[in-house]
Amino acid sequence: MRAKPQSPLPRNPVPAWSPPTTTTDPMLEKDAAGGDFPANLVLQLMPLKTFPAAIRGVIQSELNYSVILQWVVTMDPEPVLSWTFSGVPCGMGEKLFIRRLSCEQLGTYMCIATNSKKQLVSEPVTISLPKPIMQPTEAEPMEPDPTLSLSGGSAIGLLAAGILGAGALIAGMCFIIIQSLRTDRQRIGICS
């Protein structure tokens, strides 16, 4: 006597943040008639084709945008493909179109291919909203560097030294110009 067919979904679903590659979960190792496959059989989870593209098993999409999930699987005889959303059947066929994505449609999707000989399960894909862009934080006020700050007496001293330096520069330039003019007059006087 054969065991009753059980749910094709795993007892312990694989977390979406860690895309699976293989499993040995006996719940996934049932044929369509409900018979057991050998317990040491390694079941390969097949990836889905998605739009937008899934990264590490996660599709990030804005609300009201379309999401397309597709699973191309080759089995003999031809399988029946059924889609699940968080463990609940939600569609049939090779493609699942989610038009105008809403908050209620965010979650984990899987596809199950069943024929008279066996059953295959796709890798789970989680649809989520994009992570918000972090706003820049307010800059903390910087403390002035005490070695470069001027205040009080040192500021007045620097200002006075600057004024005296500028005065000396101007006086030196005037002296050079006057000397140059005197020298030119003396040359003219000698030549005449």
Curated annotation (Swiss-Prot):
Disulfide bonds: none annotated. One of its GO terms (cellular component) is plasma membrane. One of its GO terms (biological process) is osteoclast differentiation. Keywords: Cell membrane, Glycoprotein, Immunoglobulin domain, Membrane, Transmembrane, Transmembrane helix. Residues 7-18 have a biased composition (Pro residues). Coiled coil: none annotated. The chain crosses the membrane at residues 158-178. Glycans are attached at N64. Residues 1-26 are annotated as: Disordered. SUPFAM superfamilies: Immunoglobulin. It is found in: Cell membrane. It is a single-pass membrane protein. Its main location: membrane. Residues 20-128 form the Ig-like domain. Expressed in bone and small intestine. Highly expressed in osteoclasts, and low expressed in osteoblasts and peripheral blood mononuclear cells (PBMCs). May be involved in osteoclast differentiation. This is Immunoglobulin superfamily member 23. It comes from Homo sapiens.
